[in-house]
Amino acid sequence: MKLFIQWAGGKAQLLSKLKVPLSYNRYFEPFIGGGALLLNLAPKNAVINDINPDLINLYLQIRDNTDTFIERVRELDEIDCTNEIYLEKRRQYNEGTDSLSKAALMIWLNKRCFNGLYRVNKKGEFNSSYGKKDGKRSSFEESNLRGSSSSFKCRDKDGRFL
């Protein structure tokens, strides 16, 4: 499954070198990032974590509000992006909004920022510069995102995934 978000320090290029136990009852991912190992293994029982609450929110929105999330990102994708528009959307993201809109902005900004790099300043504000990706462009492949969403619906015996 393709990753739907780029993340610095991701494990996608290391998948063939990572050693994973042949059997396990529950998969724990302390630093989910882009989710390369999780999406590759597709475990039946998993718990994920990350220090970035906005990243965890993104996974929650994809899991719990897939259709509305896709709709929000599609609306953003219709914007003819320029540096000025990028900076305005980055400001909106940093000022805060509802959880669903924040997740949609996060993935939209990730596809348009310099090298897909999620970077924050000392205040904890996202400050990655514009990646000169002008115009309209898709932020995700719907079938891939829906496939990811359905795998996130796997839950442990207590009904928890994230």
Predicted regions and their residues:
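SAM-dependent nucleic-acid methyltransferase catalytic core
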Residues: 1-12, 21-24, 65-162
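A conserved donor-nucleotide-binding helix/loop in the catalytic core
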Residues: 15
